[in-house]
Amino acid sequence: MSRYLGPRVRVIRRLGALPALTNKSPKKRTIAPGEHAHKTRKLSEFAVQLQEKQKLQYYYGITNSQLARYFRQARRSKSSTGLALLTMLETRLDHLVYRAGFAPTLPAARQLVNHGHVKVNGKKVTIASWACEVNHVIEVKSSSPPKPPEYLPPYLQLSNGTLTVTQPVQKEWLAFVVNELLVVEYYTRVGA
């Protein structure tokens, strides 16, 4: 399966607010998509875990196999598995380009990276999943100045069109609400 190219507002209606997915908002319809969306029923424990996993998947624009690979790497880390998973996802190059305001959405940031408009420490990088570390300097070749982001997390520093990762990521600095423990429970249950 490749990247999700379907209707993004439908995903937002189903999973809740995902700011990186699109600039549009579901103004007309606030209920979930589908024929029987108005009928509410209690979700099972597995369904809640699956929804949290899908939130991460759609927000960061990655596939199920990529998220499973990140989970396996996070499980091997010495810190908390959930925090390590979120740190890996937050420090992806395409996500940092989006968070700095160089692109309006995550798919646009991914395209900037893929088309070779981004340099990391002075070297051109075309891999959207590039893992940035502390003290990495990110520059975007652009004719227009970046739009100032609504919220620049404390682990990023933006000056003169360059972005610097200054410290490790904390959970409080995420742009949306996610319960990473449910994602960890999901992957331990399905055996990733």
Curated annotation (Swiss-Prot):
Subcellular location: Plastid, Chloroplast
Highest taxon above the source species: Eukaryota
Gene Ontology BP terms: ribosomal small subunit biogenesis; translation
The keyword Transmembrane is annotated on this UniProt entry: no
Function: One of the primary rRNA binding proteins, it binds directly to 16S rRNA where it nucleates assembly of the body of the 30S subunit.
Family annotation (PANTHER family): 30S 40S RIBOSOMAL PROTEIN, SMALL RIBOSOMAL SUBUNIT PROTEIN US4M
Signal sequence region: none
UniProt key word rRNA-binding: yes
Origin species: Cyanidium caldarium (Red alga)
Quaternary structure and partners: Part of the 30S ribosomal subunit. Contacts protein S5. The interaction surface between S4 and S5 is involved in control of translational fidelity.
Family, per entry: Belongs to the universal ribosomal protein uS4 family.
Domain S4 RNA-binding: 91-155
Listed GO CC annotations: chloroplast; small ribosomal subunit
SMART domains: Ribosomal_S4 (SM01390), S4 (SM00363)
Protein name stated in the entry: Small ribosomal subunit protein uS4c-2
Pfam families assigned: Ribosomal_S4, S4
